[in-house]
Amino acid sequence: MADLIDVIDDVLSPELCTQLIARFEKSPNLTQGKTGGGVDLDKKRSIDVSISQRPEFADLFKQVMQLTGEQLVKYIEKYYYALVGPIGLTVRHPKTGEPVKLTGENFEEVGKPNLHNLVNYLFRIGDINAQRYTAGNGGYPYWHSEVYPQAPHNEALHRVLLFMFYLNDVEEGGETEFYYQDKAVKPKAGRMVI
């Protein structure tokens, strides 16, 4: 059975990775990394900045989101029950225009032709952070889930997928580990994990 973790190399170009790192280093908006409960150095040790909300990242964020969208559509095409399963979606048949319930059985015929629009309509991107972990000291050494209630909007409860990019190569350490899948992903510049 699939572990549902896709590792896609070279999604971000070396130039884009370098630009993101340089912009990060110059940003006046760097903050101590936070968990759902705020700053907790026992759980997360990083320096973060929102690249989706800070104007100094606007041009780079647009490029990252274009590339992210392309990969998310491919991911949902591969694991289409992430789209079909959560809600009983009714869509227009691409040939007849008649309303039809989208199912796993008719996904190829009914869902796939309009997949890009369905993904854009049903999923939303939350706040996107760039994070720096210091070798030998940084990290998120706490097994955690990305789903937790947090007032006032409970944004994390809307999360369906996690995606991340690595902006640099790390020779030793720095892996992102997935507990139940017994999988560790090594950082490599341009690599995306969904």
What are these regions (language model features)?
Residues M1-M192:
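Fe(II)/2-oxoglutarate oxygenase catalytic core
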